[in-house]
Amino acid sequence: MTDNQEIKPKKLTLGNSKLLLNKSFDSLTGVQSFVNAKSKTLVEVRKSSIGSTTTISLNKERNSLDQTVIDSNKEEFNRRLSILKKAAEQSKLYDSAQISTLSKLASINQSVNSKNEQFTTDKAVEQKQQDIEDTKVEIGTKIVQDDEDIRSQIPNKKKETFAKSLLVGMRTRYGIEAESALEKIGDNKVVVPKIKLEEPKKFKKADLFNMLSDDENGSGRTRSLASIKRAREKEKRKLVSQIPEKVYREVTIPEVIGVGDLANAMSERVADVIKELMKLGILANASQTIDADTAELVATNLGHTVTRVQESDVENVLINDDKVEDLRTRAPVVTVMGHVDHGKTSLLDALKSTDIAAGELGGITQHIGAYRVTLSDCKAITFIDTPGHEAFSEMRSRGAKVTDIVIIVVAADDGIKTQTVEAINHAKAAGVPIIVAINKIDKPDIDIERIKNELYVHEIIGEEAGGDVIFIPISALKKINLDKLEEAILLISEMQDLKASPFGLAAGVVIESKIEKGRGTLTTILVQRGTLRNGDIIIAGTSYGKVKKMINDKGREILEATPSVPVEIQGLNEVPFAGDQFNVVQNEKQAKDIAEYRIRLAKEKKISVTSRSSLEELLLKASGNSKIKELPLIIKCDVQGSIEAIAGSLLKLPSDEIKLRILHSGVGPITESDVSLAHVSSAIVVGFNVRAGTNALTAAEKTKVDIRYYSIIYNLIDDVKAIMSGMLDPIVREQYIGSVEIRQVFNITKIGKIAGSYVTKGIIKKGAGVRLLRDNVVIHAGKLKTLKRFKDEVKEVREGYECGIAFENYEDIREGDTVEVFELVQEQRQL
């Protein structure tokens, strides 16, 4: 048998021999066993948890030791086998007693040998363990040397932070616990402890946490995640327990306040405020408003102090008094008024050398324009051009409110007209100086004195007659006497000593506003006090916003506007009304508060008007006169001033039977929503200088909504007036058509009394209305039931012919009675 052949168990046994026959190795547990013939394990060698290099060297030593033991066992086995063979051959020569004695000797010998073998194996294992211990010491020394080399290259401030990651790297490199391998004492002494071999530990979350933590203390103790979680929860409980002491505030409460605003003023949660309201039996959300009394109860219940203020106090921030030392001379603001086509726009063209009349339909100015003219001596005049048509009286009235001087233009060839008188009344009401410009003096056959005499009737008296009005004959077309007009304006402005402060927050008036596609809300304003700058927050009526851009009357963008300067601004959230006062405020919150206050006032006023109107309708119904018809309209215009002028003119149309109702009005093109509203309310859509979009036109065609376009306001008013006239009930009146004299009365069976009559005048018709007169007193009024000529029924009988007649439900007819015949005729009424 060779050394490489597999050793198989022998059937022949010698007692309890511990002869080593085989070895085995378990790859899962890392255990190598040496087995004897009875499958009893003699030696078990376990794999250590040291690094790969040490493990290989130990395995080599173990294999060499095992091979030595196996070789010695083989030799002993062969020796004993030869002895057994010899004993078997000699057994024939000895008796059983001798064989028994030999067996006992062999057993004793085997026991002694077994003890020797066990001793040899224990010595080998002990030697192997000593070698492993030596290897561990070498590894520990190597770790210390590497650690010192690396630490010497690290700055002092980072050594402690880097130590943890360094030891972990060593542990990975050499396969042992780095924290237990080294213990640093002082700066130079290193003690290498005895290292206990154990299986590699499974990598846990705590190990990851330790590697990522920046513990500068270098503590080797590892905290579990559960411990960390408990510590954090404890910190949270401490924070919760440290609730700050509640602060009670002094709350200012206006007449109406929102729930959310009240909560913010008290620094309370909205939910707490809502709970307090629910205790009072009020269900409200954060966006709803409550009255001052309810708000005071809520604030008091929450421990706050309440100060009540009037809601109108929000506008107190708009009051600014100018200091006398800050006042500076400003340019005069001149308003040009007059009748239609008397030359107001042409006069402005001549003054500022621009042709704006070409852009006006029919030479009629449709909305206010503001212009600034700089004269040759660098003095400036601001002109406001108001329309001359009577429908724009509201706009002209606003123009008079903001002006310093009024120029009334009168055509020398036309004289005083209705709008001229109206302009005079507005100027007188404003209490401003008046200059009368008698225009078109270049035309032949004019009489200036006649114009002056007509103005005297309206208490417009010239200086030459002892009055204070300046008359200047001019020709805007030929530019005659324009310099005299400018001199008169400057003279009056110097006499008035016009001044304003350019400092402080700006204020002024809205001249006009509109919406332009791509630019948004455009508002023309006139600055009256302070200086308006880009970025200012302004409030105008119920509109507010930040000034994003300012453009002057020349179309150039500017950064600021001083008193008497008209500009067009962008940035308001909605279109303000012409004539609204604008003010600059400190912040957007102030502007929003003022706007909300004004909106509430407008709603209350609207509700009051609606309630009064509803009461009037109820009284009419109760009186039996409830046949009131309604004409609903939707008005869309290019500018806000036109909306007011159109609405004012339409509402002035006299009618007790037709109620004109403006469902919606706005600035901008006609939209699809306007068409939808008109469809559900059977309204007419009116567009003034605007058109409907494609979608709106498509919707109007489907729903059969009537859309009408206008460019001249009096055409619009005439059409609406005609529509309202068509809705009026016609007038029914009696039209006399003839007379009949009763000459004889006949009683006919089954028919009754028939009056034999003679037509004395006109014509008599069957079914016509009749009045029976006896001694010139009407004793019956009714209808003609029967009309016969001889025995035939006829429709009419003319004058000079005889006929037979009978009345409906009346037979008290006598000879000599007279019958008047009439028809009921309907006539269309006009407003």
From Swiss-Prot:
Q: Domain named tr-type G: which ranges?
A: 329-499
GO CC terms of this entry:
cytoplasm
Q: Where is the region G4? A: 439-442
Keywords from UniProt, A to Z, are: Cytoplasm, GTP-binding, Initiation factor, Nucleotide-binding, Protein biosynthesis
Q: Does the keyword Ribosomal protein apply?
A: no
- Entry's Gene Ontology molecular function annotations: GTP binding; GTPase activity; guanosine tetraphosphate binding; translation initiation factor activity
Q: Where in the cell is it found?
A: Cytoplasm
Region annotated G5, chain positions: 475-477
Annotated region G1: where? 338-345
Give the main localization category: cytoplasm
Going by the entry's taxonomy, the superkingdom of the source organism is recorded as Bacteria
* Residue span of region G3: 385-388
- Residue sites binding GTP per the record: 338-345, 385-389, 439-442
Per the UniProt record, one Pfam family is: GTP_EFTU_D2
Q: Where is this region: G2?
A: 363-367
Q: What does this protein do?
A: One of the essential components for the initiation of protein synthesis. Protects formylmethionyl-tRNA from spontaneous hydrolysis and promotes its binding to the 30S ribosomal subunits. Also involved in the hydrolysis of GTP during the formation of the 70S ribosomal complex.
Q: Give the family this protein belongs to, as stated in its UniProt record.
A: Belongs to the TRAFAC class translation factor GTPase superfamily. Classic translation factor GTPase family. IF-2 subfamily.
What HAMAP family is this protein classified in? IF_2_B (MF_00100_B)
Its name, as the record gives it, is Translation initiation factor IF-2
Q: Which organism is it from?
A: Rickettsia typhi (strain ATCC VR-144 / Wilmington)
